[in-house]
From Swiss-Prot:
The lineage of its organism: Archaea, Methanobacteriati, Methanobacteriota, Methanomada group, Methanococci. It comes from Methanocaldococcus jannaschii (strain ATCC 43067 / DSM 2661 / JAL-1 / JCM 10045 / NBRC 100440). It is a multi-pass membrane protein. This is Uncharacterized protein MJ1362. It comes from the Archaea. Keywords: Cell membrane, Membrane, Transmembrane, Transmembrane helix. The keyword Cell membrane applies. GO terms for cellular component: formate dehydrogenase complex; plasma membrane. The chain crosses the membrane at residues 5-25, 37-57, 71-91, 109-129, 153-173, 189-209, 245-265, 268-288, 300-320. Signal peptide: none annotated. It is found in: Cell membrane. Its main location: membrane. One of its GO terms (biological process) is anaerobic electron transport chain.
Length: 322
């Protein structure tokens, strides 16, 4: 019982502590690629979290302002639960493919809900809605900045992130089981299906974290911060924490699913191995971001289809046991 409590609290807490360094590492790598010095490693993540905590809080002009502000906390809880179930692989209610997909879908839905609630500009109530699309003509849809970001988030949920969920499914297909305990200790990556699945997973990872080139939900050119624009002060700190935690949580999930290395509190070396592998993903994503423009949906859809095709090939190989 004590070990389970330590796993539920300790593993996600350690992941969060490590994740605060990831934005700084990413910015440093990107700066070096662009022949700049860049900020200190602690500034973009660790110190930014505390900086936002001491900013002045403003209530957004939203239908449900309290719900809007607290939704990033829901995202943190979801990711905390995801890290917990990968360390407690015998917890059947959630430690399975259905639980993993369900939790991550909740995290994605946060952006759709956020964009449906707020109608202000940087915390200031406007005499008119910040309409960025549409006309006053009858039967013409009019959208605010946040609403347009929410529509884009919904498109990313339905089509963009599909390769990621397909990739999480492949290790379970080969084992003919949906439970995590059946794939832990089995390096699925070192198989033909695992190679295709890993390629599909990485493309899905970059889409899931909503970074360049898949940052259309909050591109600065039109919707600015999109659904999350009105998160201010301590609520912005919560959002920053959820973004950082997502970076390492999805990498940790790969280590568990594809290499069979679950962070076990009774075997500390597995925690080191799991998080070391998890850190590789945001670093690789940084190289993609440094050389990529923001893609439109007419470019995102083909990439998603190609990644899905790669995943389907891996799915066939997994069925064959290759």
């Amino acid at each position: 019982m004590i070990d389970e409590l330590i796993s539920i609290i300790g593993i996600p807490a350690l992941a969060f502590a490590i994740s605060t360094y990831i934005p700084g590492i990413q910015r440093k790598i990107e700066a070096r690629i662009q022949q700049r010095i860049g900020p200190s490693i602690l500034a973009p993540g660790f110190w930014a979290f505390f900086k936002f905590l001491f900013k002045e809080t403003k209530a957004p002009d939203a239908n449900l302002p309290k719900l809007y502000n607290l939704l990033p906390l829901l995202s943190i809880v979801v990711l905390w639960a995801l890290l917990s179930i990968t360390s407690l692989t015998s917890f059947h209610i959630l430690s399975n493919e259905i639980g993993i997909v369900g939790l991550l879908k909740l995290e994605e839905m946060m952006y759709v809900i956020l964009g449906s609630l707020a109608f202000s500009i940087m915390g200031w109530k406007m005499p008119f809605i910040d309409e960025c699309k549409g006309t006053p003509f009858i039967k013409t849809l009019k959208l605010s900045l946040e609403q347009l970001g929410a529509v884009r988030s919904f498109k990313m949920i339905t089509i963009g992130s599909f390769p990621f969920y397909l990739a999480t499914f492949l290790p379970f297909v080969q084992k003919k089981s949906i439970f995590l305990k059946d794939i832990v200790g089995e390096p699925f990556l070192f198989s033909l299906a695992g190679i295709f699945g890993a390629a599909c997973y990485f493309i899905g990872y970059v889409i899931m974290i909503k970074e360049y080139p898949f940052s259309i939900t909050h591109t600065k050119a039109d919707v600015i911060e999109g659904p999350t624009m009105e998160l201010i002060a301590k609520y912005r700190a919560l959002y920053l924490a959820s973004k950082e935690l997502l970076l390492i949580a999805l990498g940790s999930l790969f280590a568990t699913l594809y290499l069979g290395i679950a962070p076990d509190i009774e075997n500390p070396i597995t925690i080191v191995e799991n998080f070391a592998i998890a850190l590789i993903f945001p670093i690789l994503a940084t190289f993609v971001r440094a050389f990529s423009p923001v893609l439109l949906f007419k470019q995102i859809y083909p990439i998603s289809y190609v990644a899905t095709l790669i995943g389907v090939i891996g799915f066939i190989f997994a069925l064959l046991g290759w």
